[in-house]
Amino acid sequence: MSKFVPGRRTALIAALLATALQPAVAQAAASKSLKAQAAADVEAQTKQIQVMVDQVFSYAEPGFQEVRTSAYLSDILEKNGFTVTRGVAGIPTAFTATWGSGGPLIALGSDIDDLLGVSQIPGIPNVKPLIEGAPGHGEGHNSGMPLIIAAAIAVKQVMEKNHIPGRLMIWPGVAEELLASKAYYVRAGLFKDVDACIFTHVSNDFSTAYGELGNNGMVSVEYTFHGKTAHAAGMPWEGRSALDAVEIMDTAWNFRREHLPVTQRSHYVITNGGGQPNVVPDRASVWYYFRDRTFAAVKSMYDVGNEISEAAAKATGTTVTHQVLGYAAPNFGNKPLAEAAYANIKAVGMPKWSADDQAFAKAVQENNKRKIAPLSDKVAELSTPENRPQSIGGGSDDIGDIMWTVPTITIRYPSNIPSVIGHNVTAAMAMATPIAHKGVVVGAKAVAMTVLDMMTTPKLLTDAKTYFTDVQLKTDHYAPLLADTDKPAIWLNAKTMAELRPAMEKFYYDPTKYDSYLQQLGIKYPTVTPQ
């Protein structure tokens, strides 16, 4: 046994610690360097980001009809070295774009569809449709995939330069406003080899979240009643009115609504009420969204809806069939991924808003009688189960289907104005302005930096998968209400776009002639008075 010499043990421990810590310190420095490269590569795409955001805004295509949008975005990815597969999961406007080899497979996605009836001239603070009755980006989905594409290109460049193994899969959220694609993506196996997924959604803040997120799950169902025609005045007793059945179902549902959980949300539109009043309608349809907080609660509402439809059919001497048009699982964010992403969000920070940006935001709020709140200069806090207000139900997002398949988070990025109304023209007013462009730039930086964390830190993905299996899957299990015979409702909105597209094409953005879409439309920024 060697003799103990005072000071020698201390020196030995210090030397061992220095040796042990050296790789970690080097890795941290390398990671910081990689992230700086990615941020710079995103910044270098600022002009292309503006063009993409404006271009998709001008296409203004609703769910399943995102033909120009899908082709435009997938072409950009293809030109940047990604392998594109179009028409995945039986959806013509869906695609995957893949790149890389070895290492983990990280999926990145955002939605691309817009909303019916919310056409809006961007960059003005008052309601004024570009085309009366046309669809428009009243949810800001024109900004999400440009963000994802910019982040993916930046990550690809960094990985190539630094010889980092790993793979990317880029995908668009088709028909999110119909909640009608992502469950089919999962069923088709698009995510079976994916290690983790980052999704993005437009907001007026900059943050992410984990745990049960408070979104309702949802099933979208159309009920079609079948009756018998007759002369409505001459021989009404010979008829069996399918429209009567629809009205009885709606009335019965509205009486039942009071006795359902307070977290439920349900709404409907009559999609077919017959032809003309003097013919007893032999066919009529009503389309329902049934929403609630859990898989079981959504199924319970679906079962009640089916029972009421059968009762309405019996009451009217008709028959009924129903078809599932879409599904969305409740949302659940992954804690390790959210914490990693939030560190990057804080590192990136909010955009540097100009006086013009603040003036336009205030003008939108004032002219539409909304609460006055400036564009924020601070990132929001990380949303956790402990600091989130208790949810009593609300909207849905079919990213939930992917969240229950692989570890997933949603990053909210600041491309819109506080206080605007969702699914409304006020939410479209800023979406082709510098406010939207700047929010996409910072969002793309945070996404790119988080992807690099996943590619270079195996423990992050291990922890994410452990949380997914040991925490998330202990709370519930994925149980979509899709039958094997259910197919994506790709016919939806086709008739609307066939009628409107010729007029809309005249307003598509031409970046070869105009620096911005606002310039093409003759809008001076900021316009703060009604036009």
Residue map of PLM features:
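Metal-dependent amide/peptide-bond hydrolase catalytic core
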Residues: 29, 247-531
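Acidic/His- and Gly-rich active-site-bordering loop/insert found
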Residues: 29-137, 142, 146-167
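Acidic-glycine-rich active-site phosphate/pyrophosphate-binding loop
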Residues: 113-127, 214-224, 416-424
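Bacterial N-terminal signal peptides
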Residues: 11-23
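Bacterial N-terminal signal peptides that target proteins for export
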Residues: 1-13
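Divalent metal-coordination and catalytic microenvironments
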Residues: 56, 77, 97, 108, ...
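Histidine/acidic-residue-rich, glycine-tolerant segments that coordinate divalent metal ions
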Residues: 128-136, 142-143, 159-281, 291, ...
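Sec/Tat-exported extracytoplasmic proteins
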Residues: 42-49, 53, 57-60, 64, ...
